[in-house]
Curated annotation (Swiss-Prot):
Belongs to the BetVI family. It comes from the Eukaryota. Keywords: Allergen, Hydrolase, Nuclease, Pathogenesis-related protein, Phosphoprotein, Plant defense. SUPFAM superfamilies: Bet v1-like. InterPro entries: Bet_v_I/MLP, Bet_v_I_allergen, Plant_def-hormone_signal, START-like_dom_sf. Phosphorylated in vivo. Phosphorylation prevents its activity as ribonuclease. This is Major strawberry allergen Fra a 1.08. GO terms for cellular component: cytoplasm; nucleus. The keyword Phosphoprotein applies. Highly expressed in roots. Expressed a low levels in ripe red fruits. The gene is Fra a 1.08. Possesses ribonuclease activity in vitro. Its EC number is 3.1.27.-.
Length: 160
């Protein structure tokens, strides 16, 4: 089994504590409300919301896929780090065993956040992941992130 790693970084004007609350801790409620084309709903199928929890995410009409299952691998609220894996769903296909993510929110000098994301694609056999496929997924994630950021800018009292 090969592992393909992809790192990306982008910025936000929203400070890490507020962004983490919206983007990580309340994403299951917030995203279906503000971006139903991306995520229709999310439900916990196993666990209590902490490490080890498995969630089924029903993707919206704007997605080419129907669902994914996320497993929470790490949740560090003090340092704004979130680790999770996509362990099932039509989005990972038959060539990938799982995709593990580490998201870190770091304070930027301007008072906003630097979002550092590392993805590990655990491939079945000697399959190679095309970088264009990964970049397309990252562009969708960045678009969803901007929707969340715009929601927070429009609602300055939310998630404080």
């Amino acid at each position: 089994m090969g592992v393909f790693t992809y790192e990306t970084e982008f910025t936000s004007v929203i400070p890490p504590p507020r962004l983490y609350k919206a983007f990580v801790l309340d994403a299951d409620n917030l995203i279906p409300k503000i971006a139903p084309q991306a995520v229709k709903s999310a439900e916990i199928v196993q666990g209590d919301g902490g490490v080890g929890t498995i969630k089924k995410i029903h993707l919206g009409e704007g997605s080419e896929y129907s669902y994914v299952k996320h497993q929470i691998d790490g949740l560090d609220k003090d340092n704004f780090v979130y680790n999770y894996s996509i362990i099932e769903g039509d989005a990972i296909g038959d060539k990938v065993e799982k995709i593990s993510y580490e998201i870190k929110l770091v304070a930027s000098p301007s008072g906003g956040s630097i979002i550092k994301s590392t993805s590990h694609y655990h491939c079945k056999g000697e399959v190679e992941i095309k970088e264009e496929h990964v970049k397309a997924g990252k562009e969708k994630a960045a678009g969803l992130f901007k929707i969340i950021e715009n929601h927070l800018l429009a609602n300055p009292e939310a998630y404080n």
